[in-house]
């Protein structure tokens, strides 16, 4: 079936407006009740990161954070806390423009392995003075901000 030229132009314009929108990302600055940080090790780079992902259609931020923590780190949320930061610079990630909301979370210790081992190599609890140096893109700022007193807005 051939789409008329005028209609094709309309379809392309609508797609351009609908698909060129920032992705909504979430990450959890998650700590166990004894204060250890929960970090995941990414399989694509081997680097450490805060657990997180993208908001799915119909999800709230709370449900997305709970889902990602369960899937990636095998932990349950005990309570969500304050905002750690909002990251929206278009050049922050070369793959796409994301607006990432990072919140503090109090969680259980890992109860099960990550759901997708092709995405997550492992989960580890880190003491404050033992945090890894090798962090995934953008995570150094996010973790530093989560350790600070004031949330970041960019």
What are these regions (language model features)?
Residues 1-27:
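Acidic, metal-coordinating catalytic segment for phosphate/diphosphate chemistry
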Residues 32-75:
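Conserved Nudix-box catalytic region and its N-terminal flanking loop in Nudix hydrolases
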Residues 30-31, 39, 105, 125:
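Conserved hydrophobic "DFG−1" position in protein kinase catalytic cores
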Residues 88-112, 142, 146:
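Active-site-adjacent beta-strand/loop module that shapes the phosphate/pyrophosphate-binding cleft
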Residues 28, 83, 103-105:
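A structural signal for short, well-ordered beta-strand segments
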Residues 76-85:
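A short coil-to-beta-strand element that immediately follows conserved catalytic motifs
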């Amino acid at each position: 079936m051939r789409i008329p030229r005028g209609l094709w132009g309309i379809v392309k314009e609508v797609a351009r407006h609908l698909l060129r929108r920032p992705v909504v990302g979430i990450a959890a600055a998650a700590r166990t009740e004894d204060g250890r940080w929960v970090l995941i090790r990414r399989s694509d780079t081997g680097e450490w990161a805060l657990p997180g992902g993208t908001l799915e259609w119909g999800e709230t931020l709370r449900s997305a954070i709970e889902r990602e923590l369960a899937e990636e780190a095998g932990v349950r949320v005990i309570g969500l806390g304050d905002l750690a930061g909002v990251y929206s610079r278009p050049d922050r990630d070369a793959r796409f423009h994301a607006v990432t909301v990072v919140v503090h979370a109090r969680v259980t210790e890992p109860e099960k392995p990550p759901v997708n081992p092709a995405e997550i190599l492992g989960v580890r609890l880190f003491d404050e003075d033992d945090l890894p140096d090798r962090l995934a893109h953008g995570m150094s700022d996010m973790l530093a901000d989560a350790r600070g007193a004031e949330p970041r807005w960019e």
